[in-house]
Amino acid sequence: MAHVKNHDYQILPPSIWPFFGAIGAFVMLTGAVAWMKGITFFGLPVEGPWMFLIGLVGVLYVMFGWWADVVNEGETGEHTPVVRIGLQYGFILFIMSEVMFFVAWFWAFIKNALYPMGPDSPIKDGVWPPEGIVTFDPWHLPLINTLILLLSGVAVTWAHHAFVLEGDRKTTINGLIVAVILGVCFTGLQAYEYSHAAFGLADTVYAGAFYMATGFHGAHVIIGTIFLFVCLIRLLKGQMTQKQHVGFEAAAWYWHFVDVVWLFLFVVIYIWGR
C-alpha cells in the first residue's frame, strides 16, 4: 500500500540535472568572463572561448536530459491537471525572472544615455553615443530582423491555435517548421550584424550595454528555437494531444516573450539610442 498514489501531486525522484546544470552554468559564465576580460584562473589558459564552450555544451546536455525526463513523466501519467497547472505557474514565474534580467540591461543603457557623464557629475552635457561609435541604421538589418521575429511569432500562434482549437497536426507542424526556420534566420542575421559592427564589446559603455542586451536576447532566441524544435519533434512522434501539451504552450509563451523584448530593444537601443 506504500506505493499506492491517492493524490494529484507528483513526487519527484532524486535527479542529477539541477547539480550538473549548476556546474555547467558556472563553467559557462566563468568562461565567458575569462574570454571577455582575457584573464586566467590558477595559471590555466582559459582566456579563449574554450571554457565557455565546454560550459555551454554541458548546459545543453542538461537541458535535453531534463526535458527528456519531463516528457517521460508526462507519458507515464504523472502530469495530472494539478501538476500541469503547477508547471504553467512555474513557467510564468520563470519568464518574470527573465524580464528582470532585461530590465537591468535597459536600465544600464538608458541611464548612461541620459547621463553620459554620470548622474553625479558636475558636467551635465555629454555625447551619446560616445564619440567614435558608429551605430547601426535601424531601418536596414534591425528592421528586417524585427519583421522576421514578428512573422515567427505569427507562425507560432497559427500553429498553437491549429493544434489546440482544431487538432490539426499537419498545420501545426508546418507552422512550427516556419517558426524554427525564421528563428535560425534571425540568429544568422544577428551574427552577421555583429561581424560587421564598427565597435567591439569593450570599446565604450555604449558598446558594452548594446552587446549585453542584444546578445542576451540572442541567447534567448537560440534557446527558444531549440524549444520549438523539440516541440516539433514531439509532435512528429505523436507525443502531444489537445489536452496535454504543456511543453508546446510554454514554448509559445517563451517565444512571444522573446518577440516583445526584441520590440523594446529595437525601439530603445536601435532607434532612440542612436
Swiss-Prot record:
Give compartment(s): Cell inner membrane
Alphabetized, the UniProt keywords read:
Cell inner membrane, Cell membrane, Membrane, Translocase, Transmembrane, Transmembrane helix
Chain segments annotated as coiled-coil in the UniProt record: none
Any stretches that span the bilayer, and where are they?
16-36, 49-77, 80-115, 140-166, 169-197, 204-237, 245-274
What are its E.C. numbers?
Answer: 7.1.1.9
Q: What is this protein called?
A: Cytochrome c oxidase subunit 3
State the taxonomy lineage: Bacteria, Pseudomonadati, Pseudomonadota, Alphaproteobacteria, Rhodobacterales
Q: Which PANTHER family match?
A: CYTOCHROME C OXIDASE SUBUNIT 3, CYTOCHROME C OXIDASE SUBUNIT III
GO molecular function per UniProt: cytochrome-c oxidase activity
